């Protein structure tokens, strides 16, 4: 009898030990978004991005996807104006990896097939020369009316170059380090009302 109790006790100890060693594994992460809100309906020119950009690496093409980035433009009309011009220029476009590698990606910006560069202005509207802005044409029609006019259009954003460490350029994006890159892409808009 003592042997049976001892054997049952040992089986229970071994069984209990096995259960104690099998533990659930859980993981938790917290995502935090920075948030701001802004309303400006009085400035002569207001440009508002409509969304954010997210580039994903695709192994099949060894590259990143491109993105359409929409924006809203609002202008205050000037009843004395005889012409209107709207231009854009790239200000910042570098994303930096969020680790110690220093890897960078440069974002290219196109407007209707024309590159938006840091070195010069891209003409979006120029009523004096017959450039009426495509999707932005309501601005070309409303610049000389004494109220606000809005229109929406978009840029095409794509990854155009990168580095593995901030200096060594890559020609094959598959050689980039794994990770996440972050930064700002900023485009300056200039509007001119000619009287």
UniProtKB/Swiss-Prot annotation:
Keyword line: Fimbrium, Signal
Covalent S-S links between cysteines: none
Compartments reported by the entry: Fimbrium
GO CC terms of this entry: pilus
Primary location: other
Conditions for induction: Negatively regulated by H-NS. Positively regulated by IHF and EcpR.
Gene3D superfamilies: Fimbrial protein EcpA
Secretion signal, residue range per the UniProt entry: 1-22
Pfam families associated with the record: MatB
InterPro entries, sorted: EcpA, Fimbrillin_EcpA_sf
Family named by the database record: Belongs to the EcpA/MatB fimbrillin family.
Quaternary structure and partners: Self-associates. Forms filaments. Interacts with EcpD.
Function comment: Part of the ecpRABCDE operon, which encodes the E.coli common pilus (ECP). ECP is found in both commensal and pathogenic strains and plays a dual role in early-stage biofilm development and host cell recognition. Major subunit of the fimbria.
Protein name: Common pilus major fimbrillin subunit EcpA
């Amino acid at each position: 009898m003592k042997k049976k109790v001892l054997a049952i006790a040992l089986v229970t100890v071994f069984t209990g030990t096995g259960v104690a060693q099998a533990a659930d594994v859980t993981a938790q992460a917290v995502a935090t978004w920075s948030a701001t809100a802004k309303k400006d309906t009085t400035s002569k020119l207001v440009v508002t991005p409509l969304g954010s950009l997210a580039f994903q690496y695709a192994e099949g093409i060894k590259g990143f996807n491109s993105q359409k980035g929409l924006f809203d433009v609002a202008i205050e009309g000037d009843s004395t104006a005889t012409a209107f011009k709207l231009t854009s220029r790239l200000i910042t476009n570098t994303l930096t990896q969020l680790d110690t590698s220093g890897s960078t990606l440069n974002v290219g910006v196109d407007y209707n097939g024309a590159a938006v560069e840091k070195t010069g202005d891209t003409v979006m509207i120029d009523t004096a020369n017959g450039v009426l802005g495509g999707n932005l044409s309501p601005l070309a029609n409303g610049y000389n009316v004494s109220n606000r006019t809005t229109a929406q259009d978009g840029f095409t954003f794509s990854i155009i170059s990168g580095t593995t460490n901030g200096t060594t350029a890559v020609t094959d994006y598959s050689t980039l380090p794994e990770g996440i890159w972050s930064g700002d892409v900023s485009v300056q808009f200039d509007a001119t009302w000619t009287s």
